[in-house]
């Protein structure tokens, strides 16, 4: 039997149980990874899944990477033989097998003796307000409502704010100067609410906000939980390498970015220096996954597996191999080199 399947069969959590079942019930399982879109009008990439010999078992998959789909009488003969046991070692993902055997071998060798992000930091999501536009105010709105500045906390609302090496007090001052809605109304339970805040909560915007799922399922509805001031922020969607930006202004962040809390004794400067290495760029590609439109997505569980600053000689064939591997993975997610 044969199916057209989403290309996320190469990385999605559901692909693990599916391919485990296929390997345990078919004598032959082949995946044809098609780099150029099968259906150009769709944002979804598609691959082909072929299985034969129902009732049998197999200890390997055949992954055939092809540039462009064309109609043929039978599946491609050539491909990479992927042992099921080795596929499991790669977190039951097929995407790493788009790389050459040399690149995979180097990745495993370097990663084995290197530190991963989860060894030096905790990575989580930011807070969820349930009504972002209501809980984030512009300075002019706060002034108009009579809400005191000490109740407003500078906030990173999305990845667009992650520019440069750090968010500084100058960054926050720029938000104020440009009257941007980057200030969270940060209220705490048990604190008496000023009259101006009560009026704001009882406004039409407040009445609408409290009907949202998140707001109506917390008490009190206007206290946003899980608000933290991390050491850094990490973009979870990116074109090139995800941005790791230091938090020098005690900002907080929504769940549109990841929050990074360093372990004791760790330095954000050292971490950023390591983050910029080619090997870490490759690790982001290997541990993350395509989102569509050329974007790379890095979930918290994927981010903690990213290898930090794996060392290869920058003048060596190893470094050239890493650079080529990064380029290969980006081509498969249709990332246009030179954009970011």
Language model segments and positions:
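Polybasic, glycine- and aromatic-enriched phosphate-binding surface used to engage nucleic acids
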Residues: 96-316, 320-336
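Signature of N6-adenine DNA methyltransferases within the class I
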Residues: 1-134
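Acidic, carboxylate-rich catalytic segments that either coordinate divalent cations
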Residues: 339
């Amino acid at each position: 039997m044969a199916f057209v399947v989403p290309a996320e069969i190469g990385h999605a959590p559901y692909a693990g149980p599916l391919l485990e079942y296929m390997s345990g019930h078919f004598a032959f399982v082949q995946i044809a990874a098609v780099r150029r879109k099968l259906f150009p009008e769709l944002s979804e990439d598609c691959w082909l899944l072929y299985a034969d010999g129902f009732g049998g078992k197999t200890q390997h998959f055949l992954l055939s990477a092809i540039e462009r789909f064309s109609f043929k009488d039978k599946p491609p003969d050539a491909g990479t033989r992927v042992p099921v046991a080795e596929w499991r070692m790669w977190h039951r993902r097929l995407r790493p097998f788009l790389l050459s055997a040399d690149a995979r071998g180097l990745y495993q060798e370097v990663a084995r003796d290197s530190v991963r992000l989860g060894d030096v930091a905790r990575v989580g999501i930011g807070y969820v307000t349930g009504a972002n536009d209501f809980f984030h105010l512009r300075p002019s709105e706060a002034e108009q409502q009579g809400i005191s500045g000490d109740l407003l906390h500078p906030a990173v609302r999305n990845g667009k704010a992650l520019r440069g090496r750090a968010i500084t007090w100058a960054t926050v001052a720029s938000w104020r100067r440009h009257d941007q809605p980057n200030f969270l109304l940060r209220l705490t339970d048990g604190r008496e609410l000023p009259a101006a805040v009560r009026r704001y909560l009882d406004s039409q915007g407040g009445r609408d906000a409290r009907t949202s799922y998140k707001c109506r399922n917390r008490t009190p509805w206007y206290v946003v939980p899980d608000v933290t001031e991390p050491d850094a922020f990490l973009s979870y969607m990116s074109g090139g390498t995800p941005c790791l930006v230091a938090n020098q202004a005690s900002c907080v962040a929504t769940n549109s970015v990841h929050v990074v809390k360093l372990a004791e004794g760790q330095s954000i400067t050292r971490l950023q220096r390591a983050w910029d290495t080619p090997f870490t760029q490759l690790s982001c590609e290997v541990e993350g996954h395509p989102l569509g439109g050329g974007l790379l997505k890095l979930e918290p569980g994927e981010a903690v597996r990213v290898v930090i600053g794996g060392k290869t000689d920058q003048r060596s064939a190893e470094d050239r191999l890493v650079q080529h591997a990064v380029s290969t993975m980006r081509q498969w997610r249709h990332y246009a080199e030179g954009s970011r």
